[in-house]
């Protein structure tokens, strides 16, 4: 068989880069051109903003997205839509339109592009000269768009076709960029005339002449006739036109710059040495052209010899005239000055006198008188010009400010100017000497409370008396600020409880008096006093509120100053009263609801919130209040119990999640010890003697027993779940530590830290994060990992069920075969040999039924297998040779059988009979 020919179309485009692009997922083979350019010049890794012009289908965008840093801005533009590419922004627009520029400005905002890449080409197919000019024009248009968005020092990469306009483009590139280099990557086909120009270091000029980027001026062809006229006017002979001497200015002022002669010599000019008579040099007009065109100034004529006798013609001038090609700038200037002096000496040029200069300066000019209309027109023109000048000046000033602002934003030097704007003047507490007053937050909360409920006269008097305290006393102000901070923190917790179920469940546990932290062993008298104080307080106060009330009661005051005691007493009463009022508003009773149902009283303060919103808010606050664990023991009817169960479902879920996430360390200690309960201070409360401190039955902590039993059951079912628990268990088992040692470790200096006078938010933060770290061992981590590996090695539920079903079916088949074997064995009509053979067949059939029947392998009879006799190469087991004809016939046979309603089988199948050979009717 002949070898399969590789597909080759479009001059071999299906090369290795084509297959590499398909393997790596690039949309075009042109992506490797940018990859190789970036490998050589390394411009993508340092860029943060990139613009791809003529980007379809998106190969260069994929490369830019791959090599540029993360969070870079990449924008692609093309006439046709581009399929989305990760980390890029694309849109379809013409790069010559103003709409394209506006859309780019909207996307870039204040950014400037670090790199602009262009790999576009126009529609070709006409004359080659026209296609080359269209490509050069497209490149110049992309450059015009690039200079608008490029930052200083940016890079511009473009594709250029080799043509006569290539040098003009390079000249423009060199004027705008510091470094311009043309290269042809290996991925570019050799038959293609494309080359790539990498322009680095954009100069960012202040202004660019529009003609500089206009194709009509950049690619303009010079007329040879006009060049000849210019050379004749300059005094350059035709014999020197086209030579290096023709560029006289370059030869005079840049003598080191060598210009090669690429156009040959003039007709009839067989020498390279040209001499100029001195008198012709003196009388000529184009001095620079003559100095750059000729090699020597001779004094051979009679008129020229007279010049040698002049005093200005010294030996230095004669030496300079002998060879003009070796002179420098200073020598050429000396020759030009010598020419001026000789022209004055010969009378060709007349010197200007002082009287002539004065006459020229004082020359009078007759001014015609202007009529009234002309004066009005001149005045209007002057005013318009002045207004235009002022407008230009203002526009220039705004542009400068805008440029400075953009520069600051690019350098990240901006300062947010709206700091403090959200605080109103009435909240700044003007007149009390402080710039920021925390009392403003309390005033806002009080205003909201006034809108929700009418405050009684005695309450308002208490609030006013608490506000008008002596601000001059720093201690009083500090205590007042602490009280205000606590009030704001309580308001924050209330709002957080409305939003977050986890936070609400956590606060419910903290409010529970049973979860109060241990503060040491006290005497019976102190305990009795604490019990009396607890009975006097609100029943809703839990362990955390007890801490707050104890902190307020244990404050030390100045007993010498009676006024301070009075102020502090009023302040405490105001704080307690405000807390009580908040609880009353948060937990509306039946009386309060009845009061709300009555017509509202007339007041000077009117709420802007509707009654529906107020009722919804009160219902939310009521639901939060009844979520307290104290209400869970109340007897409810069936409907109320069902509603309470639905409301508390979220809280229970949140409590379980938080307990699993945050209290792993505490659970580990309790899991190891069994009956040991580890709190934030990590030690166990040791019970006292039963005779001295007997606990009544009604005060026994049943919830604690349930919690411990639940922990023990969880440990028994699932084992230890944390590394700390495993480490402590290993230490106990290996006799490295005893239970008494663990109890002793629970007593530390942290258990008796004085927390009086500390703010509530600080105590909450300490309770959450201030915990003792339990050391873990490498063996504990290894044990947990081994356990996790064992759990991971177990099959999933579906696989296990499938294996169980397969095993069950096998057992059923064996059981069925065993019953048949017993029946055969009980039959006395057959011999033992026949019984044995029949039983063996039954067992083999039952086992064979469990095995999967091998499918017949189909081999297509084409290619190397066409006309093959014997087993095809590479096939094992049963096989069947098929061909397209057989496939079509089988499909037709099935279709016909389905139409006739027949079942496929050997009885229905009939042999094929050629047409014309069947039986005649």
From Swiss-Prot:
This is AdoMet-dependent rRNA methyltransferase SPB1. Component of the nucleolar and nucleoplasmic pre-60S ribosomal particle. SUPFAM superfamilies: S-adenosyl-L-methionine-dependent methyltransferases. One of its GO terms (molecular function) is rRNA (uridine-2'-O-)-methyltransferase activity. PANTHER family: PRE-RRNA 2'-O-RIBOSE RNA METHYLTRANSFERASE FTSJ3, RIBOSOMAL RNA METHYLTRANSFERASE. Required for proper assembly of pre-ribosomal particles during the biogenesis of the 60S ribosomal subunit. Keywords: Coiled coil, Methyltransferase, Nucleus, Ribosome biogenesis, rRNA processing, S-adenosyl-L-methionine, Transferase. Pfam families: DUF3381, FtsJ, Spb1_C. Residues 448-476, 491-604, 635-713, 814-835, 866-921 are annotated as: Disordered. Its EC number is 2.1.1.-. GO terms for biological process: maturation of 5.8S rRNA from tricistronic rRNA transcript (SSU-rRNA, 5.8S rRNA, LSU-rRNA); maturation of LSU-rRNA from tricistronic rRNA transcript (SSU-rRNA, 5.8S rRNA, LSU-rRNA); rRNA methylation. The active site is at 159 (proton acceptor). Residues 868-879 have a biased composition (Basic residues). It comes from Mycosarcoma maydis. Residues 491-522, 814-823, 880-892 have a biased composition (Basic and acidic residues). Residues 367-414, 796-835 form a coiled coil. Belongs to the class I-like SAM-binding methyltransferase superfamily. RNA methyltransferase RlmE family. SPB1 subfamily. The keyword Coiled coil applies.
């Amino acid at each position: 068989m002949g070898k399969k020919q590789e597909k080759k179309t479009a001059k071999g485009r299906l090369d290795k880069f084509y297959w590499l692009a398909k393997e790596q997922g690039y949309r075009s083979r042109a992506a490797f051109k940018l990859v190789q350019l970036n490998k050589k010049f390394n411009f993508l890794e340092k860029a943060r903003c990139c613009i791809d012009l003529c980007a379809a289908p998106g190969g260069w965008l994929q490369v830019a997205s791959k090599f540029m840093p993360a969070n870079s801005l990449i924008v692609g533009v093309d006439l046709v839509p581009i399929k989305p590419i990760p980390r890029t922004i694309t849109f379809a627009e013409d790069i010559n339109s103003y709409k394209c520029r506006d859309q780019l400005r909207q996307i870039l905002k204040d950014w400037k592009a670090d790199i602009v890449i262009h790999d576009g080409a126009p529609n070709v197919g006409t004359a080659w000269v026209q296609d080359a000019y269209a490509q050069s024009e497209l490149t110049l248009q992309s450059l015009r768009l690039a200079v608008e968005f490029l930052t200083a020092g940016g890079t511009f990469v473009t594709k250029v076709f080799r043509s006569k306009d290539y040098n003009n483009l390079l000249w423009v590139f060199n004027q705008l960029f510091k470094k311009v280099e043309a290269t042809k990557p290996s991925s570019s086909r050799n038959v293609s005339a494309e080359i790539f120009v990498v322009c680095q270091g954009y100069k960012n000029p202040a202004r660019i002449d529009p003609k500089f980027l206009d194709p009509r001026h950049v690619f303009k062809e010079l007329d040879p006739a006009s060049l000849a006229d210019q050379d004749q006017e300059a005094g350059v002979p035709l014999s020197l036109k086209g030579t290096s001497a023709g560029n006289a200015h370059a030869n005079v002022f840049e003598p080191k710059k060598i210009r090669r002669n690429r156009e040959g010599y003039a007709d009839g000019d067989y020498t390279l040495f040209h001499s100029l008579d001195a008198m012709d040099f003196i009388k000529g007009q184009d001095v620079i052209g003559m100095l750059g065109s000729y090699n020597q100034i001779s004094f051979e004529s009679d008129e020229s010899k007279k010049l040698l006798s002049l005093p200005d013609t010294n030996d230095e001038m004669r030496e300079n005239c002998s060879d003009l090609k070796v002179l420098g700038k200073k020598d050429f200037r000396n020759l030009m000055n010598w020419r001026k002096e000789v022209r004055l000496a010969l009378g060709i040029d007349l010197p200007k006198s002082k009287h002539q200069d004065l006459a020229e300066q004082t020359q009078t000019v007759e001014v015609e008188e202007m009529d009234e209309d002309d004066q009005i027109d001149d005045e209007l023109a002057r005013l318009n010009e002045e207004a235009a000048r002022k407008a230009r000046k203002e526009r220039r000033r705004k542009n400068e400010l805008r440029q400075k602002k953009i520069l600051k934003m690019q350098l990240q030097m901006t300062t947010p100017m709206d700091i403090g704007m959200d605080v109103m003047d009435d909240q700044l507490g003007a007149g009390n000497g402080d710039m920021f007053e925390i009392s403003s937050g309390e005033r806002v909360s009080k205003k909201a409370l006034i809108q929700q409920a009418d405050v009684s006269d005695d309450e308002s008097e208490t609030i006013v008396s608490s506000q008008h305290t002596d601000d001059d006393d720093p201690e009083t102000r500090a205590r007042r600020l602490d009280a205000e901070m606590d009030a704001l923190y309580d308001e924050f917790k209330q709002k957080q409880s409305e939003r977050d179920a986890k936070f609400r469940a956590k606060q419910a546990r903290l409010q529970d008096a049973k979860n109060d932290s241990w503060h040491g062993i006290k005497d019976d008298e102190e305990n009795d006093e604490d019990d009396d104080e607890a009975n006097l307080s609100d029943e809703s106060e839990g362990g955390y509120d007890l801490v707050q009330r104890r902190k307020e009661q244990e404050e030390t005051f100045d007993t010498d100053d009676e006024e301070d005691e009075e102020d502090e007493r009023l302040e405490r009463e105001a704080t307690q009263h405000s807390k009580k009022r908040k609880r009353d508003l948060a937990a509306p009773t039946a009386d309060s609801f009845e009061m709300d149902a009555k017509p509202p009283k007339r007041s000077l303060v009117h709420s802007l919130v509707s009654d529906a919103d107020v009722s919804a808010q009160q219902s939310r606050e009521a639901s939060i209040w009844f979520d307290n664990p104290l209400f869970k023991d109340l007897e409810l009817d069936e409907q109320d119990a069902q509603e309470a169960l639905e409301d508390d479902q979220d809280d229970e879920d949140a409590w379980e999640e938080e307990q699993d996430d945050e209290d792993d360390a505490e659970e580990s200690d309790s899991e190891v010890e069994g009956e040991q309960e580890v709190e934030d201070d990590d030690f166990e409360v040791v019970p006292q003697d039963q005779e001295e401190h007997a606990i009544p039955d009604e005060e026994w902590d049943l919830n604690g027993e349930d919690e411990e039993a639940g922990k023990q059951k969880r440990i028994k079912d699932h084992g230890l779940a944390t590394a700390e628990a495993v480490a402590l268990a290993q230490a106990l088992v290996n006799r490295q530590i005893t239970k008494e040692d663990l109890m002793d470790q629970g007593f530390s200096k942290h258990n008796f830290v004085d927390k009086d006078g500390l703010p509530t938010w600080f105590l909450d933060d300490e309770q959450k994060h201030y915990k003792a770290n339990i050391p873990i061992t490498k063996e504990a981590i290894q044990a947990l990992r081994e356990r996790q590996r064992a759990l991971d090695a177990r099959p999933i539920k579906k696989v296990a069920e499938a294996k169980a079903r397969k095993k069950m079916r096998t057992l059923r088949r064996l059981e069925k075969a065993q019953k048949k074997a017993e029946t055969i064995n009980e039959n006395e009509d057959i011999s033992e040999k026949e019984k044995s053979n029949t039983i063996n067949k039954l067992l083999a059939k039952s086992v064979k039924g469990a095995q999967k029947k091998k499918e017949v392998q189909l081999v297509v009879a084409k290619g190397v297998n066409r006309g093959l006799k014997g087993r095809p190469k590479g096939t094992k087991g049963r096989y069947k040779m098929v061909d397209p004809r057989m496939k079509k016939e089988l499909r037709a046979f099935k279709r016909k059988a389905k139409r006739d309603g027949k079942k496929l089988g050997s009885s229905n199948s009939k042999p094929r009979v050629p047409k014309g050979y069947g039986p005649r009717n």
